Amino acid sequence: MLNMIGISPIKPIITKVDPQDARKICSFVVPDSKMGDLYLEMKHPQNGFCHSFITELRNRFHKLLGYEEFAYFNDAKDIYGLHIRVGDEYQRKGYNLGEILRLSSIIEIIENKIKNFNILSKDTAIYFHSKYKFKPDVTSVSDCDRLLKTVIEDKTPGFEKIAGKAKVLMQKIESVKSKEEQQHFCEVTNGILEEYITKAIETKTQKQHPFTSTMNMTLTDDTVYKNKEFFNDLFKKHGIDYKI
């Protein structure tokens, strides 16, 4: 069990990218996990149109267990998640390596005053990202159609009301012409998708409600602060001395 009696939480090391770059990156140790001490390090960016970072999580033998790639575009207060992955042999084994990687990006949001962390989630990772407060952020009518079909086709008892909402909305979307209407219906679609995902998580039936396509998702700084106790508890759980 993490953060046991006698195990002192370890404070992350926060440093600037370089003396001319005010952005900050972090590294930290996860003490006495199920796999022993784990070491997380954010690597320096490569310059170009955007600044790409990679966060690596390794064990005491320096074996790479998981990583996340993300990017800042110049002069933007957004982060764009490119890829997050944990080694196949460590997935769904209770090691929570993906959770540790996600906590490093929460630190990145706070320390750099980031407004939005944007990702394109693959279908099998939507529930993972939702667990850490990412929300659907669909912005095109074609994506609305594609994702609403998943909800409409779900015949599981208890999900009829949400499926009905999705069906009515899709019928309305078919006649959409103006950009203003498109934006409105995308916002409504995001609400329905969030309701659907939340219900699946609350009933612990995610496997019975799979998505079959990618989804744009966003974690905002407002959402992080509203859920700071949730994230602070996760930092404590993993022995990371950090509070929002």
Feature map (PLM): residue ranges:
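Acidic/histidine-enriched, beta-strand-rich ligand/metal-binding domains
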Residues: 91-93, 127-128
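Terminal substrate-recognition subdomain of acyl/acetyltransferases
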Residues: 2-22, 118-244
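A metal-dependent hydrolase signature that marks the N-terminal structural subdomain at the beginning
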Residues: 8-43
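Short, surface-exposed basic-aromatic patches at helix termini and helix-loop junctions that form
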Residues: 104-111, 132-135
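Conserved acetyl-CoA-binding loop-helix of GNAT-fold acetyltransferases
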Residues: 92-107
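A conserved beta-strand-loop-helix scaffold within acyl/acetyltransferase catalytic domains
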Residues: 33-88
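Generic recognition of long tandem-repeat/solenoid scaffolds
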Residues: 24-28, 50-59, 81, 211-219, ...
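Conserved GNAT acetyl-CoA-binding A-motif
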Residues: 107-122
